[in-house]
């Protein structure tokens, strides 16, 4: 189940498995259409699962009350380097933070003493260094550690300028080592990577940069940055070097509402950008470059990668794989796979250059913020992450991840309580192995009836199946996220789909009336309450000093007359303010004459959807009148409104 409270959890989950239907398999496998060409299994099966972890830095020990922001890499000699912030005041830039480092010479089993790469200064004038990111030139052996240099301003407060002596500019620094990270030289590159004087702030995305292996830009070093442009928008930009780090330049800034972002080289030499979304969509943003990271195409939302607006990591599982090979398409991704909190630390695997992510496993179900991955010389992987108590290192292999390259889809579906629906299952076996007896396991409520079948999986081909779901008559209306796991002898793949029960289609709705909406200073459009995304919200007008206060109202046109029996309210997810308290609900057949209130009451501060129910009635319009706010504030904000009724 999802951790997003907007999607209801199915109570007391039961795992229901379905074996393939032999008759269906015999009838269809021979005619299965070819999938993406696969030359052998991209991920080798077998081996004993491995997952170990240990703390490298614990808050309050070894001189610093707080440690944050992990970076991880392997030196050309095979040593493992871990870098992170030591924060004497526990705050981000501007603060007297230091860039620290520990080294392992035995593949991460043991670690040397904590050392300083760039030392902050706690006495006036205060200076600090934060947010490390490693980048290794595999051709020369040079190691770079990019980080922030702050004096008086952090990312939000930095002003335009590039003078290294200006204390009100947040600067870009890079430390360089030619002896495997034992000693470092330092320089400020703010002017080098600021082609537009309107860029008033920048910082390197912590973790690890990349070096391209394929095509005309092979050897290029790329480190990702986030900048604030003249309009105040957060944009992503690749900073790169074609002369082994002697000089650095910035490519074209991309997107809006970006934040910490990473890149990975795809099997054909294109560069995939994967970004935190400061606009809070609840997912990762992605874009693709065809010119080695200088510029990027359109930015889109990857709805296979839920994210709570957090830093993440994306790498090639087999960094030395030949261009175009099956292994070159295998990517690993780590993040906090929740849309509402920094938790549920998860590693995912893609076998098709990030088009799908069928394999996932949780490594930290509790608190987990930033993380970074790197491939180790012995074929395992290093993971450095923030568990909430400092910096922790983990070592794992693909056998522990336990996946098979077989992405599958089950479409979202809507039905009424007491109804039954059958939906198709489509599986693409990207692996080079046959799976004669796959099974499908679904997380289902114990009172839901589910039946299904899946064909055998042939190498490089598509397979079909189906799932039939019967929802009891008394099921509470809502959107239910159902997890599905394809289980095979070679490993598992997973996906989710949404079963909508007893709710009208938001896509057919429109805003009939609203007392005010904030569009000048933020995206507080009223239409956000029917966009299906709880990360967006309607906000009443606030940018004018004389903006109206309570009561507030918003009315929906349902797109036709329906028999309805309730309204579901979801509060704004990322703020404790502007929460509706007392309310009234009205309905109308024509949008002019209103009946009611048909329901009234007081909402709580819960993040989950809250129901206001009333006797079933025919209506085309429904109105929420907000009478008060939970803490007495003047404004109102609503993430989503759903209408209970018959479609």
Swiss-Prot record:
Binding site for substrate: 68, 276
Location in or out of the cell: Secreted
Record-linked SUPFAM superfamilies: E set domains, Galactose-binding domain-like, Sialidases
EC top class, as a word: hydrolase
Matches recorded under SMART domains: FA58C
Record-linked Pfam families: BNR_2 (PF13088), F5_F8_type_C (PF00754), NPCBM_assoc (PF10633)
Annotated BNR repeat ranges: 102-113, 175-186, 239-250, 287-298, 348-359
One function term, GO molecular function aspect: exo-alpha-sialidase activity
EC number(s) recorded for this UniProt protein: 3.2.1.18
Domain of life: Bacteria
Keyword Chaperone tagged: no
Residue span, F5/8 type C domain: 496-646
Major location (coarse): secreted
GO cellular component: cytoplasm; extracellular region; intracellular membrane-bounded organelle; membrane
PANTHER family in the record: EXO-ALPHA-SIALIDASE, SIALIDASE
Protein family: Belongs to the glycosyl hydrolase 33 family.
Record's protein name: Sialidase
Protein source organism: Micromonospora viridifaciens
């Amino acid at each position: 189940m999802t951790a997003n409270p907007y999607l209801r959890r199915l109570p007391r989950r039961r795992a229901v498995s379905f074996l393939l239907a032999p008759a269906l398999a015999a009838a269809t496998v021979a005619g299965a259409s070819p999938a993406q060409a696969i030359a052998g299994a991209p991920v080798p099966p077998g081996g004993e699962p491995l997952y170990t972890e240990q703390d490298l830095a614990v808050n309050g020990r070894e001189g610093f009350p707080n440690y944050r922001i992990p970076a991880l890499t392997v030196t050309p000699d095979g040593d493992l380097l871990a870098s992170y912030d030591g924060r004497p005041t526990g705050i981000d830039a501007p603060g007297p933070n230091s860039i620290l480092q520990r080294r392992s010479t035995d593949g991460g089993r043991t670690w040397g003493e904590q050392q300083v790469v760039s030392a902050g200064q706690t006495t006036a004038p205060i200076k600090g260094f934060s947010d490390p990111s490693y980048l290794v030139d595999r051709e020369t052996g040079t190691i770079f550690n990019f980080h922030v240099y702050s004096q008086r301003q952090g990312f939000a407060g930095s002003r335009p300028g590039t003078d290294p002596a200006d204390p009100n500019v947040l600067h870009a620094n890079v430390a360089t080592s030619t002896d495997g990270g034992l000693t470092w030289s330092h320089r400020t590159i703010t002017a080098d990577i600021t082609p537009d004087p309107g860029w008033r702030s920048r910082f390197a995305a912590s973790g690890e940069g990349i070096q391209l292996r394929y095509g005309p830009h092979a050897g290029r070093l790329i480190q990702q940055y986030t900048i604030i442009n003249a309009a105040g928008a957060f944009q992503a930009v690749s900073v790169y070097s074609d002369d082994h780090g002697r000089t650095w330049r910035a490519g074209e800034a991309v997107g809006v509402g970006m934040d910490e972002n990473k890149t990975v080289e795809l099997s054909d030499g294109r560069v995939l950008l994967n970004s935190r979304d400061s606009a809070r969509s609840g997912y990762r943003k992605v874009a693709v470059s065809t010119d080695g990271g200088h510029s990027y195409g359109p930015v889109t939302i990857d709805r296979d990668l839920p994210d709570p607006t957090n830093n993440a990591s994306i790498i090639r599982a087999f960094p030395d794989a030949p261009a175009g090979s099956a292994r070159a398409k295998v990517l690993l991704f780590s993040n906090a796979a929740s849309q509402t909190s920094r938790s549920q630390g998860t590693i995912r695997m893609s076998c098709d250059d990030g088009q799908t992510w069928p394999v996932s496993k949780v490594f930290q179900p509790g608190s987990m913020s930033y993380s970074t991955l790197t491939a180790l010389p012995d074929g395992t992987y290093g993971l450095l992450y923030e568990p909430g108590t400092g910096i922790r290192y983990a070592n794992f292999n693909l056998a522990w991840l336990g996946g098979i390259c077989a992405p599958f889809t089950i479409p979202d579906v809507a039905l009424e309580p007491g109804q039954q629906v059958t939906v198709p299952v489509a599986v693409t076996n990207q692996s080079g192995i046959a799976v004669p007896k796959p099974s499908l396991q679904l997380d289902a409520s114990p009172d839901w009836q589910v039946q299904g079948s899946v064909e055998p999986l042939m190498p490089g081909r598509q397979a079909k199946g189906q799932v039939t779901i019967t929802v009891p008559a008394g099921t509470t209306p809502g959107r239910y996220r159902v997890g599905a796991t394809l289980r095979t002898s070679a490993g598992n793949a997973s996906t989710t789909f949404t079963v909508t029960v007893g709710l009208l289609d938001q896509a057919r709705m429109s805003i009939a009336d609203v007392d005010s909406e904030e569009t000048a200073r933020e995206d507080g459009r009223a239409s956000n309450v029917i966009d299906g995304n709880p990360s967006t919200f309607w906000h009443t007008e606030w940018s004018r000093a004389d903006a109206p206060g309570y009561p507030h109202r918003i009315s929906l046109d349902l797109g036709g007359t329906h028999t309805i029996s309730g309204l579901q309210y979801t509060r704004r997810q990322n703020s404790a303010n502007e929460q509706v308290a007392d309310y009234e609900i009205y309905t109308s057949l024509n949008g002019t004459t209103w009946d009611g209130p048909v329901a009234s009451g007081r909402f709580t501060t819960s993040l989950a959807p809250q129901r206001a129910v009333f006797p079933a009635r025919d209506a085309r319009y429904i109105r929420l009148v907000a009478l008060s706010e939970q803490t007495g504030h003047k404004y109102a904000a609503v993430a989503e409104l759903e209408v209970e009724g018959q479609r």
